[in-house]
Structure formats: structure tokens, C-alpha cells
């Protein structure tokens, strides 16, 4: 019988509001409110996932300068299953394909351009593509591991935060692929706009494996409908590192490959900014990661689709 080995990694996926205020605070020499410095990030991760075990088996090795290619994003098929989770402030929709977070609705924030409707940030529809994806990359050429395109089973559980409860979780589990199974668990707390995301990589083979875990934010390059013609807020990816601090990148510059970001770091985050809101993947402080941004063709009929910001981190199990 094979010895089953596991690597468990917790990360934070969060949303922020009033991004312009945040940037104004930094510009004036104050601490960022929504996009903290690395020291603040560590506290955010601790607060959002209190009593959560620290990452296990994550090596200190430098991320390869030429990491394996992240699987290409593809348009969502019509036969995918949606799973909804609701807290007091968020309505979340997940796709069983990859356990992807595909829609986020803010229940306490009305959309100024759509009276009677709430703000929707992440979305996977005919009008918008904006999703948060994760998956594994094998270190062995030609060997496929579970990715954001892998069908996953959702475990039974509570789907709406109950009165008196402080948190709820939803778990997606892939089938074993080349001796490796990926189990994702999203945990969100009452009143919170961030969540702890646990990646449990189960190695059932007799071989040691050194996969890479990728985190990406994918969005089309279109502005929000109804945005004022007199002013325009930034929409696009952003990155924070110690070396180059906060950098935002225009979609047009990504398409032209005319941008300069820090490509390797042991701190920081990637984000996708949309109007006054943003989402971000925040990895544990001190964990090496490779950072990239690119334009990808997902086979969608939508104009200017799509772009992705990606973090890739090494693992060992």
C-alpha cells in the first residue's frame, strides 16, 4: 500500500473597497488600508485564518526563473455546475470545474449603475469574465496534475451561514490524477470580505513530487458599463512587491508586452482592480513566488478577452 503524503498550504483571497482612498493614503505617507505592507499582510493572514495551521512542506528554494506554463484559460462550458454559498455580506458562486470562484456579489452594496441590484465583482457570464483560479503544475513534462480545468466533486455541507454561526466552509475534491489529488477548501467568516483558501495536495504515489501551485485572476479587458465619460477609474491587474512596491498595469500594455513588474518575490500579492473594488491573492509572507501577467485567448466571443495575473509557488510532497 502506498504511503500517502500531504502538503497543506493556506492562502488568503480577499476583496477590498474604496481602492482610490487606499492609494491616496499611501501617496500621503500613511499606511495602506486595503492593500497592506508585507508586515500588515502577515497580520491579515493571521486574522483571517486564526488557528489555521501554517503551511507544511513548502520549501525555501527559489522559484524557477522559467516556471512551467500555467494551463490556458478556456471559456466556460454551459454544462458546468454552480454551487452557491452565502454569508451575511457575500453571495459566492463556485464552479465545479476546478473549484473556481466565479461570481461574488456584495449583499450590502448597491450598484450605482444598476438600481435595485447589488455590486457584482467576480462574474462569469456573457457580459463579463472575471474569475479566481488555482491549480497544480507538474515538474515532469507531459505529466498532468489537477488544474482549474479539472472536474471536482463538492462535499456536502452548509451553504448559507446560519444564525449564531461565525464561519462556513466549502470543499472541492479532484479525482486522483497521476498519483496526485487536489482538495480545495474555502472558509469565510461572518462579516468578512476575505477568505482562507486551503490547498491539500495528496500524493498517493511512491514517488516524491515537486509540483508548483498557481493562483491567477482572469478578466476581460473591458470597462464597466455605465462608467462616466468625464472621468475613468483604473481597471486592470496590479502587483505589490518589496522591490517595486505597488504597480498597476494597463491591459493595453499587457497586450503589447510593454510593462515592467517584479517577476520574483517572497512577499506581496497580485490583484485585479475594477472601478472602486479589487480582489487579491495573498500568499504567506516569506514564501517564494513567481509573478506574471499575460493576454490569453480563451475562445470567447467577447471583445478584448482575456488577461490574467498569476502567482506560481513551489511545493514539495
Segment roles from a protein language model:
Residues 9-20:
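Hydrophobic membrane-insertion alpha-helices, especially the h-region
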Residues 10, 23-121, 172:
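Juxtamembrane extramembrane loops of integral membrane proteins
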Residues 77, 82-317:
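Soluble non-transmembrane domains of integral membrane proteins
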Residues 1-11:
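Membrane interfacial helix-start segments of signal peptides and signal-anchor transmembrane helices
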Residues 5, 21-22:
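Residue-level micro-sites within transmembrane alpha helices that shape
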Amino acid at each position: 500500500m502506498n504511503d500517502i503524503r500531504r502538503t497543506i498550504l493556506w492562502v488568503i483571497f480577499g476583496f477590498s473597497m474604496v481602492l482610490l482612498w487606499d492609494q491616496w493614503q499611501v501617496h500621503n505617507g500613511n499606511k495602506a488600508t486595503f492593500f497592506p505592507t508585507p508586515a500588515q499582510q502577515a497580520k491579515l493572514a493571521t486574522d483571517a485564518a486564526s488557528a489555521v495551521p501554517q503551511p507544511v512542506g513548502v520549501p525555501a528554494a527559489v522559484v524557477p526563473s522559467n516556471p512551467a506554463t500555467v494551463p490556458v484559460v478556456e471559456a466556460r462550458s454551459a454544462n458546468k455546475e454552480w454551487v452557491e454559498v452565502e454569508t451575511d455580506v457575500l453571495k459566492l458562486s463556485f464552479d465545479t470545474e476546478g473549484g473556481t470562484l466565479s461570481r461574488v456579489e456584495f449583499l450590502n452594496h448597491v450598484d450605482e449603475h444598476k438600481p435595485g441590484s447589488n455590486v457584482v465583482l467576480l462574474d462569469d457570464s456573457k457580459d463579463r469574465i472575471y474569475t479566481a483560479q488555482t491549480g497544480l503544475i507538474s515538474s515532469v513534462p507531459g505529466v498532468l496534475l489537477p488544474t482549474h480545468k479539472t472536474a471536482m466533486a463538492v462535499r456536502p455541507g452548509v451553504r448559507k451561514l446560519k444564525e449564531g454561526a461565525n464561519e462556513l466552509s466549502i470543499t472541492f475534491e479532484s479525482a486522483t490524477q497521476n498519483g496526485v489529488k487536489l482538495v480545495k477548501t474555502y472558509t469565510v467568516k461572518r462579516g468578512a470580505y476575505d477568505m482562507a483558501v486551503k490547498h491539500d495536495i495528496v500524493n498517493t504515489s511512491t514517488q516524491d513530487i515537486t509540483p508548483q501551485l498557481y493562483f491567477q485572476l482572469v478578466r476581460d479587458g473591458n470597462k464597466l458599463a455605465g462608467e462616466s465619460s468625464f472621468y475613468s477609474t483604473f481597471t486592470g491587474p496590479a502587483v505589490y512587491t518589496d522591490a517595486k512596491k505597488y504597480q498597476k498595469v494597463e491591459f493595453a500594455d499587457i497586450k503589447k508586452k510593454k510593462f515592467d513588474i517584479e517577476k520574483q518575490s517572497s512577499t506581496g500579492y497580485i490583484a485585479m482592480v475594477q472601478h472602486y473594488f479589487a480582489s487579491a491573492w495573498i500568499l504567506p509572507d516569506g514564501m517564494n513566488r513567481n509573478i506574471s501577467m499575460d493576454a490569453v485567448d480563451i475562445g470567447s466571443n467577447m471583445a478584448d478577452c482575456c488577461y490574467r495575473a498569476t502567482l506560481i509557488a513551489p511545493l514539495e510532497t
